[in-house]
């Protein structure tokens, strides 16, 4: 792809998201979603291949369906209230449709089927944009309409997402699919707490984006996309491999790493609201995520997959890819837990 065209597409992608985040008018938000989608599809096709074509087609169909549902919800709300303002969502039908549309855009269960398939068909850098930046616009709308969303529908989808995110990643060997299922589970955690404490959702989103950015940057540094290639990185880049394992455990929510903090604070907030069964279910289901991350860490750290001797010592040049933000991202991804008391005061 021509670098100038790529920069224009990237600028349009950023502008579309910013338009959704900053607008208080439904039409402007919808236009922002469309700008974002139309700019992202050519970025997915940057390296043309049948898999990229399939992934971008799936992405287009799901996002177009979600946009149509969103516009239908806006029109129903307009008919009943005469309001274009995002925060004034009064009609229950419009609220339910809006929740479903945004759930499709976020990839919440049971509308999650496109996320692993699309993530697997695109390069690591594009996958990073899909699982981080592309979550900002739908979550910002959910944040604004959180007082009027259908609570039971939202909580059902959130719990399903946590369950699917744990189960789906259990038998995966492709790292991009594992990250996709992890994203589904994290979105479940964020949307569970949204009706009770939206600020906590933003904190969870910030930590999730940092951890996902760190993981993808580490994968890009080593050019690893499968568990087999990850298990063979210890003799090429031992420090990066160690940091990869730490970040994986943090994503699984293992204390005393940063990933444990949002889970702890969400469970604490739910128990403060006298909700006991749901956080218990969430904590037990989170063990599924932790299990496949620990299995991945174990296979990377202690064992080698069956391979011939000449595969064990992979020859290559020293890594020359620059990643200036990586050290900071690793520190935030693994060492944020001691700041929990300060952050809980702010929340």
From Swiss-Prot:
Core subunit of respiratory chain NADH dehydrogenase (Complex I) which is composed of 45 different subunits. Interacts with TMEM242. It comes from Balaenoptera musculus (Blue whale). Core subunit of the mitochondrial membrane respiratory chain NADH dehydrogenase (Complex I) which catalyzes electron transfer from NADH through the respiratory chain, using ubiquinone as an electron acceptor. Essential for the catalytic activity and assembly of complex I. GO terms for biological process: mitochondrial electron transport, NADH to ubiquinone; mitochondrial respiratory chain complex I assembly. It catalyses: a ubiquinone + NADH + 5 H(+)(in) = a ubiquinol + NAD(+) + 4 H(+)(out). It comes from the Eukaryota. It is an enzyme of class 7 (translocase). Its EC number is 7.1.1.2. Belongs to the complex I subunit 2 family. Signal peptide: none annotated. Its main location: mitochondrion. Keywords: Electron transport, Membrane, Mitochondrion, Mitochondrion inner membrane, NAD, Respiratory chain, Translocase, Transmembrane, Transmembrane helix, Transport, Ubiquinone. This is NADH-ubiquinone oxidoreductase chain 2. GO terms for cellular component: mitochondrial inner membrane. One of its GO terms (molecular function) is NADH dehydrogenase (ubiquinone) activity. It holds the Pfam family Proton_antipo_M. It is found in: Mitochondrion inner membrane. The chain crosses the membrane at residues 1-21, 25-45, 59-79, 96-116, 122-142, 149-169, 200-220, 239-259, 274-294, 325-345. The keyword Translocase applies. It is a multi-pass membrane protein. The lineage of its organism: Eukaryota, Metazoa, Chordata, Craniata, Vertebrata.
């Amino acid at each position: 792809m021509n670098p100038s065209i790529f920069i224009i597409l990237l600028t349009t992608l950023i502008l579309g998201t910013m338009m959704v985040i900053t607008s208080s008018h439904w039409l402007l938000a919808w236009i922002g979603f469309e700008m974002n989608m139309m700019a992202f599809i050519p970025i997915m096709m940057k390296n043309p291949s049948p898999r990229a074509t399939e992934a971008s087609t799936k992405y287009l169909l799901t996002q177009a369906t979600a946009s149509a549902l969103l516009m239908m919800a806006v029109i129903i709300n307009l008919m009943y209230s005469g309001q274009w303002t995002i925060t004034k969502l009064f009609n229950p039908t419009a609220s339910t449709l809006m929740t479903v549309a945004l759930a499709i855009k976020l990839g919440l269960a049971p509308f999650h089927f496109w996320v692993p398939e699309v993530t697997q068909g695109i390069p690591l850098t594009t996958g990073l944009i899909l699982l981080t930046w592309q979550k900002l616009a739908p979550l910002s709308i959910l944040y604004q309409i959180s007082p009027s969303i259908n609570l039971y529908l939202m909580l059902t989808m959130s719990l399903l997402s946590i369950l699917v995110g744990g189960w789906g990643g259990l038998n995966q060997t492709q790292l991009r699919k594992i990250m996709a299922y992890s994203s589904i589970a994290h979105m479940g955690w964020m949307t569970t707490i949204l009706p009770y404490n939206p600020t906590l959702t933003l904190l969870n989103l910030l930590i999730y984006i940092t951890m996902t950015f760190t993981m993808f940057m580490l994968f890009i540094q080593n050019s690893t996309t499968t568990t087999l290639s990850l298990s063979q990185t210890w003799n090429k880049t031992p420090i990066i491999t160690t940091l990869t394992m730490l970040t994986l455990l943090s994503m699984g929510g293992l204390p005393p790493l940063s990933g444990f903090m949002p889970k702890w604070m969400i469970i604490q907030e739910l128990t403060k609201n006298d909700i006991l069964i749901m956080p218990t279910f969430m904590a037990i289901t989170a063990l599924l995520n932790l299990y496949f991350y620990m299995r991945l860490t174990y296979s990377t750290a202690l064992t080698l997959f069956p391979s011939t001797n000449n595969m064990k010592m992979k020859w290559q040049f020293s890594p020359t890819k620059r990643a200036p933000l990586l050290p900071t991202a690793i520190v935030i991804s693994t060492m944020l837990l001691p700041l929990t008391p300060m952050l809980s005061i702010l929340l």
